[in-house]
């Protein structure tokens, strides 16, 4: 395409292709192919350079920047010639390598040519700027052009897909992949834009809009779907401001003519986690920030949101604005798109509400309840907003979040949630709502885009994330990478299929390679059974599965077994990885943390159930199918694993499978998007980043595949034309030669590798690089040719110039000669005459020419006029022809349209014809059936008449019964009137209750359901009527009778409908009556709750009030239990409704609700009553309507009865139905009567209960009045005791809490003691049973001895039989010798054979004798070993039973041999049996399967040797082979059992690890409890300080009362003595406890001895193994409880220690204040009181600790005993195994001897005939069966040994733990004793200080008395002086 052709692209041309001048300049650039190379560089990855030298595998290159580097030869890559610079298809390059691809993309990107082809790929680089390459001009430029005709562009890919679809009639797909920010979404938009434009152009004008369907054209809708999907599916990421966080597959459907028909969208892998979490440089989905722009203020109010994103933490964790995005404009586009796509106004506001609710979810807060782990809401404001937006009840939602109901077994249980669990549930719900809403919007968009226009083909556009390799790769990355792996496999397969199809078409020999299989290992590792996804889904099924167990399963299954699965190498600074996968793009390390939770994606089912009942229709629709999916997994998906739910991975695989199926059914086109740099800088390309993407997105993979084949190809003509210069002599001149032959000759004559090219039918194919070499050779040849041509041309030019010079010289010579001659003759006279005549001759000729020209002119003028006239005529004809042509074109277009319409109509007619034919056939068949039935029914007509009369009688009975029901209804109506009057008096209390509205709505809904049921009945009758009208021809003879019957039945129906109405009214009355009674109960309950609140407020006043309140609470609980009992009774009544018929089901439900109305149906008021009346009126109106409908039906029936002649069959069915209805009505009436009676009884019971409740409430009122009076009395006491009670009440609570804890501990220990006693009793019973078993075993041993003696006797008989056999052998020998003399020469050979056999028999008999002797020794040795084995009673027991069976078989065999066979053969048979039984014992003990196989192979070889001598043994060998096969099967079975045992052992180890993790969790909880106790103790210390300050104030106020201090001193002395006495008692108790512990140890030792005896019975121990496991678990639980109680005791001790320190501090303060005696004495008294309380507490703690120590010692000793017994058993098993090993070695020798004897015996036995051989074979099979049984028993024994070994290890570990616990308890007791001693010493010191203070006190008191005496003396003196002064004054006055 030249520059002129590129002008059609307008301004975009310069961004699409280089100009011709640039291309020519590039080709003329100097280039040396031998030295131009790319070189590896650590900074830039690759650099251009010039090769300097190559030596020893090293290459020296000088880069263009002047730097010289030396690298390995494989680190340099050849450059392509300049003609390939900026090449549009990189697959055409000569040298296909990474740097060539990189620099080609880089140079094109620098010129802003962002699109480049790479084989089948179109690679696009993000320009980060706007380029004018998407205008309408560009769309038109690409339309209809082939790929090679236009520059690379996304429009070219789109147009090719469109044209392929039209020409090939095949669906197409465009696969667009790349990393985030690479431009996938933009290119997807451009593809859709192109299809929308082209599809709209190819069709006629826009169709008429369908009313109510959509707004805007289909093209507008397809384009408008993007803004909505982007708002809800796009977000800002680190690399991209508008990153699609989901994959999508958009199908654009076209009609047959290429017209755009419809579209639909499928989405994949929406990133839900972004809703609740964003990185710092990212933000959540655009819609959240668009809503908060404030563009629509009414939305802010409707959604209860603000314009500040930081008010919503869930969406403001990262950035909140994006520079490149205007949220206001985007919001306008989103809102407009919703309207264009046809969403209704309700749906639109629902979408916004749910979006706002998701934002509010992040503001919900929860806190932990005090002293509990249970979460509770921290405020309900946010919950109220969410509930409003989602159409829920906020209280129900919070309850469901904090207390969800879960299914445990078959019951629903309420479960408490912690704060983290609730927060996780809230996050999961918000993500689920957002995801479901997004998927619903996609479905709605698809519905709107489905225009119902005819569509034939589609083009799919896949926009999905590319391969991802991050530092932290999780499940999402695995899904994305797996998707890309599948897509790359699809591409590889498709690409090389196309390549190889071309090879096949061109006839090139090529072995097919499926490059899709290159990725099979990784794909199968992920998706096949026992792959990663399979194991992940399997782990999700197990409730106790963890990430660790998942990792272990992965490693066990694949590590070391699958090459693609590797163990990651730990790297510094990177996240931990658990496994690595080898993908086509590289090895990726995956972290599996949280995969199980992500895969299960759990939701709070309680909240989901609320969603399903939401008043917001969209939300209810989103979760409508959630319950069904959770319960059954869907009907169609029942085959899936688990069945109960569908995991994320399973759903992902299902969607991926559908996607791949879609893609495989299409012709794909591939687009790969690249990010040039991380900084979003236009024009900059980072080499490392681009190469990484090229590897990830498969471009380099495609190049790799290209290099496998022949990527370069040229047509033969082009090749011949271009490369003919290489050897022109091969192609002869002047004669025709085929281009292919010429190319073959040309290539054959050139010095190149002839394996690097192939010849096709039309092209020659080259391997990568060969074409470049040919180009180099051509350049060199052209250089030589040009040089030669230049030389030839120069020579030719010079020769031509020389010739011209010579000719010029000759001309000059000739001119000079002529001029000289003229000068000589010009003056001659004749010459002058010639000069005069010459002009005259010329003028005459001119006149003649002029005359001729005039004639020509006239002639031409006439021709011109004729031509003009003819031209005019032709023009007129042309105009008319053009007009006709246009008319014909219009007719052709109209005819083509008519033809297409006719074809469509023809197709429709054909389809309708087929359907009508099928219907006709069905109708004919049905007509035949109806005729047969009619013939039968004419005979049954008379029976119908009789039955109709019976029906009339039954209807009369029904009328009587209904009359009774109507009377009862009037009675209930009167009751209702009375009850409604009582309801009016209680309106005020009823007004407070708001829940009645919901109940009323439910009742209304039920009434509507009743109405619907009646309408269904009417519909049923209508259908029956239509059937009757269709079947009317055969009933004309019985018209009147059938008419009367129908009228009677209709009357009965009307009566029944009236009864139904009456029954419904009676139900309503009963409901009102019940509600009134329940209302009273509710009122009383409300009063009770008020009383309870008052009583709880006054609980702190004293123990008496608390007791009374507890009594009231107990009474209330009794009342609640009675209410619950009443509810249970009502539930029982409800169950009785299940037996009613289907048509009266609604009536029975109402009756049951009357018997079981819930508490929500209590309060009724006048408004509700009015609604009830309205409902009744509606019901009456509906009944009237039904009656009118029924009357209309009857009228229609009466009109159509005249035509009912031929339909006797239908009447028969009607009769049967009526009979059924009659029986049902009878049953219903009986049930109604019984239900009415039951309701009446229930009503009477309820009234009685109400009266009793009222009496009880009146009693409670009186009691509450008394309580109030007592409270008033106590208020006065409270004022006096406020200060003391405030302090001591807290202490009392603490002590009570401590006492309750100690009491619980004591109860727990008591239960443990009882359990231990019970276990001891069980062990004693087991011991007795074992003793009995020992006795029976001894008895069996005696029997075995007797059997052994009998066996010795049998052995002697065998020896006698053997001697007899020897004599018989001698006789046979002599007999054969004599016969040999008499026989002829023909039998000579047979005689020799028999003699040889006799000799062999003698040798075998001798060997048998020696083996018998050795067997006897073996038996003696085995007897000694049997006596040794008698120690193990259990093994001896089983062995005795086995030997008993074998002995009986042995006796039978002996008897048969005595009767039928020679005694020598009997001896051999017995030896054989005994040898085989010994070998089975050996197999049993050692599980030696391999030796058994060797043994059988030896048998097979020896039998083959015998076959050479005796041909009759062939059958026996076959049987032996079969037995070997069976034994091999047995071996495989045992090996499978072994693997099962191994898996069981691994599961047990996993369980042990799980239990250890539980112990760690318990210890962590204990630490938390300990910290909590420390905190509480700190609070108690503060309270102690407060008490101390209060005591100080009291002391200051009592300084004046010295006498009371004396009394207090005496009290202190008494307290001291009491404390000393208590301490002595505690010491005595401690010594008693120690003695009791010693006694318990003795008892434990006795029990240990008993248990040792009991453990001798092995079978009993095996049966008790499970019990022991349970005991271990119980011991562990008890240990955990003990540890918790020990921590509590420690906390209490620490508290006591703090109290002691406080006391010491107070004593120091007292010593400092020597002058304040009263305060010091008082503090000492307080300290003594506190110490006394502490001592009492310590005494209780010591008792508990001692008890704990006893229990722990008992457990430890029991565990030690168990461990010792298990160790002893293990040792015995080991001894037994060693003993059996020795037996095995001895028996191996014996087995070999016996085997030899067996072979010889078999050879002898063959002489006895085939009959004997068959018996031997049957015996062999029996023995082989015994071998298998013994092998199974051996395997069981090995299992038992392993179990006991594990048990010994567990008990040893438990023993060590118990020992540690005992040591800790002993240390605790010692510490307590030390503390008691310290307290004693402190008391003595306090006593000494008290004495010192008393002495000082006495001294001061004595000084005070002296001062008082001095004061008295002074006072007396003063009085005297006053008296004197008064006397003196009086004397003065008198004077």
Swiss-Prot record:
Polar residues bias spans: 1592-1603
Pfam families in UniProt: Myosin_head, Myosin_N, Myosin_tail_1
Gene Ontology MF terms: actin filament binding; ATP binding; calmodulin binding; microfilament motor activity
Location of region: Disordered: 1589-1608, 1902-1935
S-S bridge residues: none
Residue ranges, annotated region (Actin-binding): 659-681, 761-775
Every Myosin motor domain range: 85-779
SUPFAM superfamilies: Myosin rod fragments, P-loop containing nucleoside triphosphate hydrolases, Tropomyosin
Chain sites annotated for binding ATP: 178-185
One Gene Ontology cellular component: myosin filament
Predominant cellular place of this UniProt entry's protein: cytoplasm
Coiled coil regions, renumbered to chain: 840-1935
N6,N6,N6-trimethyllysine modifications at: 129
Domain (IQ): residue spans on this chain: 782-811
Signal sequence interval, chain numbering: none
CDD domains: MYSc_class_II (cd01377)
Highest taxon above the source species: Eukaryota
Keywords assigned by UniProt, alphabetized: Actin-binding, ATP-binding, Calmodulin-binding, Coiled coil, Cytoplasm, Methylation, Motor protein, Muscle protein, Myosin, Nucleotide-binding, Thick filament
InterPro entries: Kinesin_motor_dom_sf (IPR036961), Myosin_head_motor_dom-like (IPR001609), Myosin_N (IPR004009), Myosin_S1_N (IPR008989), Myosin_tail (IPR002928), P-loop_NTPase (IPR027417), XRCC4-like_C (IPR014751)
Region named Hinge: 812-839
Subunit structure: Muscle myosin is a hexameric protein that consists of 2 heavy chain subunits (MHC), 2 alkali light chain subunits (MLC) and 2 regulatory light chain subunits (MLC-2).
Domain notes: The rodlike tail sequence is highly repetitive, showing cycles of a 28-residue repeat pattern composed of 4 heptapeptides, characteristic for alpha-helical coiled coils.
Function noted in UniProt: Muscle contraction.
Family that this chain belongs to: Belongs to the TRAFAC class myosin-kinesin ATPase superfamily. Myosin family.
Stated name of the protein: Myosin heavy chain, fast skeletal muscle
Organism: Cyprinus carpio
Species classification: Eukaryota, Metazoa, Chordata, Craniata, Vertebrata
């Amino acid at each position: 395409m030249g520059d002129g052709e590129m002008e059609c692209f307008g301004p975009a041309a310069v961004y699409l292709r280089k100009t011709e001048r640039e291309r020519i300049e590039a080709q003329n650039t100097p280039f040396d192919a031998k030295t131009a190379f790319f070189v590896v560089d650590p900074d830039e990855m690759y650099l251009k350079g010039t090769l300097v030298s190559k030596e020893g595998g090293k290459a020296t290159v000088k880069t263009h920047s002047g730097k010289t580097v030396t690298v390995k030869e494989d680190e340099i890559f050849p450059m392509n010639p300049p003609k390939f610079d900026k090449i549009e298809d990189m697959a055409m390059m000569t040298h296909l390598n990474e740097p060539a691809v990189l620099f080609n993309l880089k140079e094109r990107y620098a010129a802003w040519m962002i699109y480049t082809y790479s084989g089948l790929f179109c690679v696009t680089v993000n320009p980060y700027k706007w380029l004018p390459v998407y205008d309408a001009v560009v769309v038109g430029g690409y339309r209809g052009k082939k790929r090679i005709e236009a520059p690379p562009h996304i429009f070219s890919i789109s147009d090719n897909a469109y044209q392929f679809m039209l020409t090939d009639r095949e669906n197409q797909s465009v696969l667009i992949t790349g990393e985030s920010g690479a431009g996938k979404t933009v290119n997807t938009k451009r593809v859709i834009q192109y299809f929308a434009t082209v599809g709209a152009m190819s069709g006629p004008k826009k169709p008429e809009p369908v009313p109510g369907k959509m707004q805007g054209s289909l093209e507008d809708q397809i384009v408008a779907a993007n803004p909505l999907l982007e708002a809800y599916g796009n977000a800002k990421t680190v690399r991209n401001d508008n990153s699609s966080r989901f994959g999508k597959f958009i199908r654009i459907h076209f009609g047959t003519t290429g017209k755009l028909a419809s579209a639909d969208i499928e989405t994949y892998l929406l990133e839900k986690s972004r809703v609740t979490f964003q990185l710092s440089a990212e933000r959540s989905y655009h819609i959240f920030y668009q809503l908060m722009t404030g563009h629509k203020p009414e939305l802010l109010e409707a959604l209860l949101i603000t314009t500040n994103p930081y008010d919503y933490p869930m969406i403001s964790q990262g950035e909140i604005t994006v520079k490149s995005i205007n949220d206001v404009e985007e919001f306008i586009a989103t809102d407009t798109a919703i309207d264009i796509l046809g969403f209704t106004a309700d749906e639109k506001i629902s979408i916004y509400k749910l979006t706002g609710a998701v934002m509010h979810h992040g503001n919900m807060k929860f806190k932990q309840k005090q002293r509990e782990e249970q979460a509770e809401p921290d405020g309900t404001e946010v919950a109220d907003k969410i509930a409003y937006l989602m159409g829920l009840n906020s209280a129900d939602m919070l309850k469901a979040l904090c207390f969800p109901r879960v299914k445990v077994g078959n019951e629903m249980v309420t479960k408490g949630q912690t704060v983290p669990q609730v927060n996780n549930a809230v996050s999961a719900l918000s993500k689920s709502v957002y995801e479901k809403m997004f998927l619903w919007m996609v479905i709605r968009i698809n519905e709107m885009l489905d225009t119902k226009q005819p569509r034939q083909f589609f083009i799919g556009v896949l926009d999905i994330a590319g391969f991802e390799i991050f530092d932290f790769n999780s499940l999402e990355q695995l899904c994305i990478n797996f998707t890309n792996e599948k897509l790359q496999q699809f591409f590889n397969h498709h690409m090389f299929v196309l390549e190889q199809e071309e090879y096949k078409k061109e006839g090139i020999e090529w072995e097919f390679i499926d490059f899709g299989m290159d990725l099979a290992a990784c794909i199968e590792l992920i998706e096949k059974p026992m792959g990663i996804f399979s194991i992940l889904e399997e782990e999700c099924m197990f409730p106790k599965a963890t990430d660790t167990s998942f990792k272990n399963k992965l490693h066990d299954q694949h590590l070391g077994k699958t090459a693609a699965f590797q163990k990651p190498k730990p790297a510094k600074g990177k996240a931990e990885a658990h496994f690595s996968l080898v993908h086509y793009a590289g090895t990726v390390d995956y972290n599996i943390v949280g995969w199980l939770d992500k895969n299960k994606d759990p939701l709070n089912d309680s909240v989901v159930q609320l969603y399903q009942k939401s008043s917001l229709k969209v939300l209810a629709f989103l979760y409508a199918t959630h319950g069904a999916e959770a319960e059954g997994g869907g009907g169609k998906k029942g085959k899936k694993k688990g069945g109960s739910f569908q995991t994320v991975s399973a759903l992902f695989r299902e969607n991926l499978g559908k996607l791949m199926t879609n893609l495989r059914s299409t012709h794909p086109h591939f687009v790969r998007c690249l990010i040039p740099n991380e900084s979003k800088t236009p024009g900059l390309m980072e080499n490392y980043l681009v190469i990484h993407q090229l590897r990830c997105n498969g471009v380099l993979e495609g190049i790799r595949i290209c290099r496998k084949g022949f990527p370069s190809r040229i047509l033969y003509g082009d090749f011949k034309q271009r490369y003919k210069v290489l050897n022109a002599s091969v192609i002869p001149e002047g004669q025709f030669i085929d281009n292919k032959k010429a190319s073959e000759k040309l290539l054959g004559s050139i010095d190149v590798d002839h394996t690097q090219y192939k010849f096709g039918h039309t092209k020659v194919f080259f391997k990568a690089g060969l074409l470049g070499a040919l180009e180099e050779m051509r350049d060199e040849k052209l250089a030589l040719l040009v040089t030669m041509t230049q030389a030839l041309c120069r020579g030719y030019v010079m020769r031509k110039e020389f010739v011209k010079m010579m000719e010029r010289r000759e001309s000059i010579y000739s001119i000079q000669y002529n001029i000289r001659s003229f000068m000589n003759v010009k003056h001659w006279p004749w010459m002058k005459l010639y000069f005069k005549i010459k002009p005259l001759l010329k003028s005459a000729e001119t006149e003649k020419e002029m005359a001729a020209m005039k004639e020509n002119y006239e002639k031409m003028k006439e021709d011109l006029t004729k031509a003009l006239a003819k031209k005019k005529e032709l023009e007129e004809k042309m105009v008319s022809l053009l007009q006709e042509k246009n008319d014909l074109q219009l007719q052709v277009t109209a005819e083509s349209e008519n033809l297409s319409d006719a074809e469509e109509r023809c197709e429709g007619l054909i389809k309708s014809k087929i359907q009508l034919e099928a219907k006709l056939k069905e109708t004919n068949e049905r007509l035949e059936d109806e005729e047969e039935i009619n013939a039968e029914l004419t005979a049954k007509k008379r029976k119908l008449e009789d039955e109709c009369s019976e029906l009339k009688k039954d209807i009369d009975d029904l009328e009587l019964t209904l009359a009774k029901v109507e009377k009862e209804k009037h009675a209930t109506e009167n009751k209702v009137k009375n009850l409604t009057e009582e309801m009016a008096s209680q309106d005020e209390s009823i007004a407070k209750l708001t829940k009645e509205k919901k109940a009323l709505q439910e009742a209304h809904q039920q009434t509507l359901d009743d109405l619907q049921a009646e309408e269904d009945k009417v519909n049923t009758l209508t259908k029956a009527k239509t059937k009757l009208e269709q079947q009317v021809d055969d009933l004309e003879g019985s018209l009147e009778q059938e008419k009367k019957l129908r009228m009677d039945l209709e009357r009965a129906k009307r009566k029944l409908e009236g009864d139904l109405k009456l029954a419904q009214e009676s139900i309503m009355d009963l409901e009102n009556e019940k509600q009134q009674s329940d209302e009273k109960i509710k009122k009383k309950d409300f009063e009770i709750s008020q009383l309870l609140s008052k009583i709880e407020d006054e609980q702190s006043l004293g123990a008496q009030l608390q007791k009374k309140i507890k009594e009231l609470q107990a009474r209330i609980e009794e009342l609640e239990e009675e209410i619950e009992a009443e509810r249970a009774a009502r539930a029982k009544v409800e169950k009785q409704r299940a037996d009613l018929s289907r048509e009266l089901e609604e009536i029975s439900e109402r009756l049951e609700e009357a018997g079981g109305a819930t508490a929500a149906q209590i309060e009724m008021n006048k408004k509700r009553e009015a609604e009830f009346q309205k409902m009744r009126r509606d019901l009456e109106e509906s009944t009237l309507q039904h009656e009118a409908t029924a009357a209309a039906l009857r009228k229609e029936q009466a009109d159509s009865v005249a035509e009912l002649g031929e339909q006797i069959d239908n009447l028969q069915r009607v009769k049967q139905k009526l009979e059924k209805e009659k029986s049902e009505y009878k049953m219903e009436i009986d049930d109604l009567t019984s239900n009415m009676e039951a309701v009446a009884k229930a009503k009477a019971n309820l009234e009685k209960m109400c009266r009793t409740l009222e009496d009880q409430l009146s009693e409670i009122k009186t009691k509450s009045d008394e309580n109030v009076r007592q409270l008033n009395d106590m208020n006065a006491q409270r004022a006096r005791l406020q200060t003391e009670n405030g302090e001591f009440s807290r202490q009392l609570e603490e002590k009570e809490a401590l006492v309750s804890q100690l009491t619980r501990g004591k109860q727990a220990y008591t239960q443990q003691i009882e359990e231990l006693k019970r276990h001891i009793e069980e062990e004693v019973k087991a011991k007795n049973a074992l003793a009995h078993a020992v006795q029976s075993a001894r008895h069996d041993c005696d029997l075995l001895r007797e059997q052994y003696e009998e066996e010795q006797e049998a052995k002697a008989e065998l020896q006698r039989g053997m001697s007899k056999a020897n004599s018989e052998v001698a006789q046979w020998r002599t007999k054969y010798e004599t016969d040999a003399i008499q026989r002829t020469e023909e039998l000579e050979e047979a005689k020799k054979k028999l003699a040889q056999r006799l000799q062999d028999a003698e040798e075998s008999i001798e060997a048998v004798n020696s083996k018998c002797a050795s067997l006897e020794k073996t038996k003696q040795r085995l007897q000694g070993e049997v006596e040794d084995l008698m120690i193990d009673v259990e093994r001896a027991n089983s062995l005795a039973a086995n030997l008993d069976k074998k002995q009986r078989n042995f006796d039978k065999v002996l008897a048969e041999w005595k009767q039928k066979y020679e005694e020598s053969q009997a001896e051999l048979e017995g030896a054989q049996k005994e040898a085989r039984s010994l070998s089975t014992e050996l197999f049993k003990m050692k599980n030696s399967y391999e030796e058994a196989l060797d043994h059988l192979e030896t048998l097979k070889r020896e039998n083959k040797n015998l076959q050479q001598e005796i041909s009759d043994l062939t059958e026996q060998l076959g049987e032996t082979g079969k037995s070997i096969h069976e034994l091999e099967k047995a071996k495989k079975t045992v090996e499978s059992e072994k693997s099962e045992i191994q898996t069981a052992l691994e599961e047990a180890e996993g369980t042990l690890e799980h239990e250890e993790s539980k112990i760690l969790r318990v210890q962590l909880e204990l630490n938390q409890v300990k910290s909590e106790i420390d905190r509480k103790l700190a609070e108690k210390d503060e309270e102690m300080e407060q008490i101390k300050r209060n005591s100080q104030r009291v002391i200051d106020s009592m300084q004046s009362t010295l006498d009371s201090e004396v009394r207090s001193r005496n009290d202190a002395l008494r307290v001291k003595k009491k404390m000393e006495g208590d301490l002595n008692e505690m010491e005595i108790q401690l010594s008693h406890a120690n003695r009791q512990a010693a006694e318990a140890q003795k008892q434990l030792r006795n029990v240990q001895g008993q248990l040792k005896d009991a453990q001798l019975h092995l079978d009993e121990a095996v049966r008790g193994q499970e019990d022991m496991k349970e005991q271990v678990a119980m011991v562990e639980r008890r240990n955990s409880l003990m540890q918790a109680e020990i921590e509590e005791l420690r906390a209490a001790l620490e508290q006591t220690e703090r109290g002691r320190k406080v006391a010491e501090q107070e004593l120091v303060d007292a010593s400092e204040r020597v002058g304040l005696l009263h305060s010091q004495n008082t503090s000492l008294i307080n300290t003594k009181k506190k110490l006394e309380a502490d001592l009492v507490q310590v005494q209780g703690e010591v008792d508990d600790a001692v008890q704990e120590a006893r229990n722990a010692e008992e457990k430890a000793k029991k565990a030690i005993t168990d461990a010792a017994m298990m160790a002893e058993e293990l040792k015995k098993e080991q001894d037994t195994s060693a003993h059996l090993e020795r037996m095995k070695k001895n028996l191996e020798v014996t087995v070999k001897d016996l085997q030899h004897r067996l072979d010889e015996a078999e050879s002898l036995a063959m002489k006895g005939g085939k009959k004997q051989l068959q018996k031997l074979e049957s015996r062999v099979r029996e023995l082989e069966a015994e071998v298998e049984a013994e092998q199974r028993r051996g395997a069981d024994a090995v299992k038992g040994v392993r179990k006991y070994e594990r048990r010994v290890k567990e008990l040893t570990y438990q023993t060590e733990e118990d020992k540690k616990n005992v040591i800790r308890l002993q240390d605790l007791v010692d510490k307590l004793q030390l503390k008691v001693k310290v307290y004693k010493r402190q008391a003595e010191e306090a006593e000494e200080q008290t004495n010192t203070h008393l002495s000082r006190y006495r001294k001061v008191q004595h000084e005070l008395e002296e001062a008082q005496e001095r004061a008295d003396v002074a006072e007396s003196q003063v009085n005297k002086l006053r008296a004197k002064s008064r006397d003196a004054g009086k004397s003065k006055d008198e004077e």
